[in-house]
Amino acid sequence: MLYCLKKEELQKLKKTHFMPEFVNAEMLSATYVTDENAAREIIPKPLLPTKTPLATVFVARYPETNFGCIYNEGALFLHCEYKKERGLYCLSMPVDDDMAMVGSREQYGYPKKMADKITVEKTENRVVGSVIRKKEEILRIECELTKEVPSNFMDDVGVQTEDWDGTPCYRVIAFLYKYFPSPGGMGFDYLPRLVREATLMRKKGEVLEGRGEVKVSSSPFDPLGDVPVKEIRNIVYGKWHNTMLPGKVIGRAWNPFKFSKHAFFKTDVVPTLLQNYDPSAEKRAREIMKVARKF
């Protein structure tokens, strides 16, 4: 009974030692130089922008996972550092499956939202990745593949290592803030937690690079255009076997009021409230809220 698991079922879950696996993940990614002032303003302390302001985007197809989801995904990250360790601060991660959205959002704090359509399309040497949300194409990567990637192609994003079986892979670190609003609508449920989550990426066959274009666009709900493309470092396409490793809390926002300016991009509610704000209605709304809290 899923609503109330038996003791032996709970024990089985514990003994699975589950880590999300993405087999034959088809990924089109790009790393580019972005605006230094934007990176400095967006990245919350104690995370620090990298010396060269970099961003990474990707569009991916996940045809096989070990958690029952087949889905597509896009993402935007700003490169950052924490205590001299390089990582990626996630700003956007649209998906097209509700369970894929819930999992990483609730456990790690990824800013996942449901998209209208996410595609990766390859014809001969041309690859196009696209993310459409709220009827707007917010991310598009186009590439003409030309050659195999050099051995150091992941240096901006991760480090070379080996997994527990000795398989060569790349370790990519994501930094995220995990938080929930309080039930009463005032502040946070708990102090926002800074989470470190590592992913191992193993090449599955040939990984290619090429020339192309990256477009990040803004809508009222998805301001990806705030991280503009200044210069493309690389565009890469290939298939991977990825494993998301257990995350860990490495810090907290001890001043939640100061942190709060970074806490409103994970939902679409705030842009709507700001757009519909009416100063003349403020007094009556405050009176109603005061009464509502007594029910």
Kindly label every feature range from the protein language model:
Residues 85:
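Short, positively charged
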Residues 73-77, 90, 126-128:
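Broad gene-expression machinery/nucleic-acid interaction feature
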Residues 1-50:
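Short, extreme N-terminal leader segments that mark the start of a protein/domain
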